[in-house]
């Protein structure tokens, strides 16, 4: 199963000082306070089973491969889901965007200023990708991410010129 809209709030950290090394990511699936992730996966598997038993699907089935016929209770389904759940395609939202100095209800602070996409406390560093999105759209996010990138490019172009002169004081 794919955790498309997990309510778990994971974390991202650097694995080494090597800038080419991939970062470490812990998505923290199934760790949300209200149990949403677990309910979503368990119910999703139950619904998939019901759909598979309807014609015309049923006539093509030989047997259920995963999670398998022995996996029937909510507890067993949850255990299975926890062992195989993963993110598909587009992890995002690792750089909280908002108004600087504002903390969210969970105490996390803003990393990127929403008005100019600048990293809080940095003069000329902007983040213009999916990491500033608080949630992903339900469709492929390519156009949304493209829009963020276009806005970032517009802001950079605007800042590159002051009174008709190209800035040199970056």
Q: Predicted segments — roles?
A:
Residues 1-144, 152-170:
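FAD-dependent oxidoreductase catalytic-site/capping-region signature
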């Amino acid at each position: 199963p794919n955790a498309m809209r997990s309510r778990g709030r994971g974390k991202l950290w650097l694995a080494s000082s090597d800038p080419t090394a991939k970062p470490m990511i812990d998505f923290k699936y199934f760790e949300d306070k209200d149990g949403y992730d677990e309910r979503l996966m368990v119910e999703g598997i139950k619904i998939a089973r019901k759909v598979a038993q309807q014609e015309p699907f049923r006539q093509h089935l030989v047997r259920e491969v995963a999670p398998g016929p022995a996996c029937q209770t909510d507890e067993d389904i949850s255990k299975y889901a926890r062992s195989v759940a993963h993110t598909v395609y587009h992890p995002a939202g690792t750089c909280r965007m908002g108004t600087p100095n504002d903390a969210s209800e969970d105490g996390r602070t803003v990393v990127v200023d929403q008005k100019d996409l600048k990293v809080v406390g940095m003069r000329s560093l902007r983040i213009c990708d999916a990491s500033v999105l608080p949630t992903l759209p339900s469709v492929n996010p390519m156009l949304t991410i493209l829009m963020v990138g276009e806005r970032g490019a517009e802001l950079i172009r605007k800042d590159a010129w002051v009174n008709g002169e190209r800035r040199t004081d970056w």
